[in-house]
Design a protein with these regions (language model features):
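Beta-strand segments within the central parallel beta-sheet cores of soluble alpha/beta enzyme folds
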Residues: 1, 11, 86-88, 125-129
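Histidine/acidic residue-rich metal-binding segments in metalloenzymes
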Residues: 1-21, 34-49, 68-83
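Active-site beta-loop-alpha junctions enriched in small/polar residues
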Residues: 4-6, 25-28, 57-59, 90-94
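Conserved, mostly hydrophobic/aromatic
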Residues: 24, 52, 90, 124
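Alpha-helix N-cap and loop-to-helix initiation/capping positions
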Residues: 33-37, 64-68, 98-105
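A conserved active-site cap/scaffold subdomain adjacent to cofactor or substrate pockets
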Residues: 46, 51-61
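Short acidic/histidine-rich active-site segments
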Residues: 56, 80-104
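Mid-to-C-terminal alpha-helical segments outside catalytic/metal-binding sites
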Residues: 102-136
Length: 136
């Protein structure tokens, strides 16, 4: 789903018989890139029981800050995405990651940023591990 056009997305939603996965997508409301998901697209994935993997690629985050990356998380959580959001990364072939990240070794920085904003360990474990594990 992460590489589909809007029309292709909805075509697939109408024929999907299993949970839908957008393996590396962010919120278009936060960063208006055509590859990011609209709120309606996120809800369709959520309602299917699927997952959306947070994309760390700078051009889909919008700004090179941790706050910009966290804004995508908070937007999806505001759409009742606690059991939908997971990590997607899109680390292969990317020349620039958000928030000064250089690779997987920096993902704990996102965990710490969310923890500092008051998110519970249980919610963060869902986002960082359980939501994707539930699906696979």
């Amino acid at each position: 789903m992460s590489h589909l056009s809007d029309a292709g997305f909805w075509d697939l939603v109408h024929i999907a018989r299993r949970p839908i996965v957008a393996s590396h997508s962010n919120a278009r409301a936060v960063c208006p890139h055509r590859r990011n998901l609209t709120d309606d697209q996120f809800r369709a994935i959520r309602d299917s029981g699927g997952v959306v993997g947070l994309n760390l690629y700078l051009h889909f985050v919008g700004q090179p800050t941790m706050d910009a990356l966290v804004a995508h998380v908070e937007h999806f959580l505001a759409l009742d995405g606690e059991k939908t959001l997971c990590l997607g990364g899109d680390l292969d072939g990317c020349e620039a990651l958000a928030a000064g990240m250089t690779g997987m070794q920096d993902v704990p920085k996102l965990y710490e940023a969310l923890k500092a904003r008051g998110y519970s360990d249980a919610l963060l474990e869902d986002i960082f591990w359980n939501n994707l594990r539930r699906l696979i």
